[in-house]
């Protein structure tokens, strides 16, 4: 009986569920000691550039995101751009670096991420953000590899995407 209870608890603790989303894998769960401070829905583009990779083959590489952040009523409350960086309507910004990722449940969509903050600007909502999750992604993958050849070197392509971003800050 104890082993059944332990197995059940392991399954429950291996993923976190946030209201209104699919199950969030433990690999991208917000660190302990952080609280959710803002949810935003992003709509925009992932911008890719066709260039030669390290092995000499042509490939699409991510240049930058370009998206608006919306509140639950659909109003624009900020922007997401190269860095990656998120800017809130109060002027505060947070930049970060992906620290973990999992494949999206939708194979035609970019991965879900956990991003660790690396820098801040301003004193507003994003001033103390320490982690950002990107979940519920739709679209955003690069064009087909066949569309990136030597003749297209330097060409940019914008792919539509949407995602939910959850911003976390220390609980204290």
Regions found by a protein language model. Give the residues of each.
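A composition/secondary-structure signal for short, hydrophobic, low-basic-content segments
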Residues: 2, 18-19
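Functionally constrained cores in energy, signaling, and assembly domains
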Residues: 6, 17, 40
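Primary mode marks residue(s) on the alpha4-beta5-alpha5 output face of response regulator receiver
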Residues: 21-46, 54-172
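Sec-dependent signal peptide recognition
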Residues: 3-10
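Hydrophobic h-region of N-terminal signal peptides that target proteins for export
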Residues: 11-18
């Amino acid at each position: 009986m104890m082993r059944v209870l332990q197995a059940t608890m392991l399954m429950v603790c291996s993923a976190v569920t946030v209201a209104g989303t699919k199950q969030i894998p433990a690999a991208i769960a917000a660190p302990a000691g952080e609280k959710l401070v803002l949810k935003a829905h992003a709509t925009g583009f992932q911008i890719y550039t066709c260039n030669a990779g390290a092995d000499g083959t042509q490939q699409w590489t991510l240049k930058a995101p370009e998206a608006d952040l919306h509140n639950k009523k659909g109003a624009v409350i900020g922007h997401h751009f190269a860095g990656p960086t998120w800017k809130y309507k109060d002027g505060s910004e947070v930049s970060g670096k992906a620290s973990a990722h999992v494949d999206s449940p939708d194979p035609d969509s970019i991965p879900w991420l956990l991003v660790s903050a690396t820098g801040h600007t301003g004193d507003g909502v994003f001033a103390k953000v320490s982690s950002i999750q990107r979940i519920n992604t739709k679209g955003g993958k690069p064009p087909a590899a066949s569309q990136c050849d030597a003749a297209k070197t330097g060409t940019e392509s914008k792919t539509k995407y949407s995602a939910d971003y959850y911003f976390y800050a220390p609980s204290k």
